[in-house]
Amino acid sequence: MIRLIRYEFIKQFCKRSILALFVVFSLANLFKIYGEYKSYSYLTDGKGVRSWHTLHWQLYEEFQGEITSEKVERLLAVYQPLVEATSDMTASTATDDPNTMTGNLYSDRNLLDKYFVQPMQYFYEYSGQSEQVANRARQSAALYGERGAVYQQRESGAIYNLYAGRTIPAFAYREMCNYYLNYDFSIVLTLLLCLYGTIGTFVSERETQMDMLLLVSPNGGRKTTLAKILAATLFLLLTSLWFSFLDLIGFAASFQTFEGLALPVFAIPNFAEASVNLSIFQYVLLSAALKCAGAWTIGMLWLLVSMFWKNALLPFVMGLSLCMALIASGAACAYSNFFWTKALNPYSLLTNRVLLGKTEFINLGGFPVLTWQAAIWFALIAGLVLVAAIYFLSAENCRRCVRREK
C-alpha cells in the first residue's frame, strides 16, 4: 500500500508544472514579504550611525528583557525631555543636530515612542487589564450560578480561566511577529496550488479510461482510490506546512531577527483578547496545524467535485468557485457575531487569526466551546465524510461507466 501511495504521489503531484508553480509561488511569497518589510517597517533606513535601524538595536540591548522600574526610569529620563521639547511643535526641525541621536528632536521622540515607550507601556498595563476581565468573569460566574443560568456560568468560568494570571514580564521587539501574524497572502497561494494539484487526481484516469481498467487490476478499484486520497492528503499537508513556515522564515530574514517569538501571543495588540495562552512560537505551530486541517477539508471537497468529470477545466472552475464562495463568506463573517458560521467554514482555519485572536464560544450541548476548537472538529468530521463519499462513490461511478460501455 505504501508503494502504491508513493506511486500516486509522484504521478500526480511531482509533475513539472506543479513543481514549477511551487517555485514561482514560493518566490512570489518571499518578494511579497520583503515588500511588507520595506513598506511598513521604520527600520529600513539603512545602517548609518544615526539611522533608526542602528539606534534601535543599540537601545534594544539596553532595554530588552525583564521589565523593571529601573529600566522604565532610564527610558523616561531620555523620553520625557524630548516630549517637553517637542510638545508645542516649536522645536528645531534641523536634521543635523549634534545633541540628538538621529539628528532631529522629533525623530528621536518618534523612535522611542514607537519602539520602546508604547510597547513597554502596553506590556506593563496588560496584566492589570486582563486581571479586570478575569475578575468580572468570576463575578459574572457567581451571579449566573445564583440565577441557575448554567451555560452562562460555565462560559464566564472559562473566560476567567483564560485571563487570570496573564502577564507580559519581559520586553522584546515585536514588529516582525506583528506583521507575520497578520499576513494572509500565502493563504491565497496555498489554495491555488492545492486546487491545481488535486483537481486532476481522478480526472487523469477518466480522461484515459484507466478508471475502468483499474477495476479488474490487483490494486484497482477502492484500493487505488484510497491511495489517491492519501497521496492527495500528503500533498495538501506538505503544501500548507511549507507556506506556513516559509512565511516565518521570510519575515525573519527580511527583518533580520527572530526576536519576539518567546513573547506571549497577547503581546501583539490585536491579539489582546486571544483565546489561547501560548507563546508566539507555540501559536505559529498551532496556526500551521489549523491551516493543514482547513486545507485538507477544502481539498477533499475539490476531490469529490473532480471525480465525476473527464476534463479538468470544468472541475477546476467549479473548485475555484467553491473556494471563492468560502472566502467571501469567511470574510463577511470574520469579525461578526456569527460564531457558528465561522466555526463551520473550513476557510476560517486558514485565516485562523479570526478564530484565535478573539475569545468566542459556541454552545455545544450546554458547554461553551471555543470557536477554533469547534472549527477543528467540524472540519475533521466534514473531511472524513467527504473521504468516505469519495471512497464509496468512486467504485460505484466506475461500475456505472462499465455498464454504459457494455
Give the ranges of each region predicted by the language model.
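Alpha-helical transmembrane segments of multi-pass membrane transporters/translocases
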Residues: 14, 18-21, 294-302, 355-406
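N-terminal, intrinsically disordered, polar/charged segments of Gram-positive cell-envelope systems
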Residues: 39-118, 124
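Residue-level recognition of transmembrane alpha-helices
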Residues: 22-25, 228, 319
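Aromatic- and glycine-rich beta-strand/loop motifs that create alpha-glucan
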Residues: 1-19
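Transmembrane helix segments
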Residues: 35, 309-345
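Secretory targeting signals
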Residues: 27-77, 128-205, 226-308, 328-330, ...
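Short helix-to-coil transition segments within interhelical loops
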Residues: 215-221
